Amino acid sequence: KISAHNIELVDAPVSGGPRGAREGTIAIIVGGSDHQFERVLKILKFISDNIIHAGTLGSGHSIKLGNNLLNLICRIGTFEVVSMLVKEGVEPSLAVSIIQKSSGRNYATEVTLPDNILSGKMNQGFSTALMEKDSSSALQIGVRHKLDMTLGKAAHTILKRTISEYGSAADISSVANYFENETGARIQPRKEV
């Protein structure tokens, strides 16, 4: 119906969080035809140079959802392993710095833990409610394609437990609190009393 009014639709979700927005490096993931992508490119360049054509309409949204589910899986796996290492007697900051220089590195070891958890800020700027929405939608894509999504479901379950404990408005960093409570391993710096 919108094409009758000479209006075209693309999807262009973003990924990279507040840090990417501040630094102008946020990824803009565009779904639409080649022609539509070329038309919106000059406008989107005002926001970021990191613009990717993902394919047809809807592809950008699907990739963003998949990316956020993968981020959740990596985050939870990283917190689980760091908790285990803390229980083993390794300082969390040392564990993270070594993992970051090794094959287990990921966004959680590069940004989440150093900038938000180990620093004590606990403010990544993305709510558990938004992550729940995106990861739930990504899992629905898996259901549509009859995929088991074992890791995604497990990560989503832990996220839902975190929301149950800390609320849907809590920052996604609160997943670290969940692991601290579950394992007794302190990842965050101790607060001065």
Map each language-model feature to its residues.
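Rossmann-fold dinucleotide-binding core
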Residues: 1-72
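Helical "substrate-binding/catalytic lid" subdomain
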Residues: 59-182
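ATP-dependent carboxylate/acyl-activation modules
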Residues: 45, 189-193
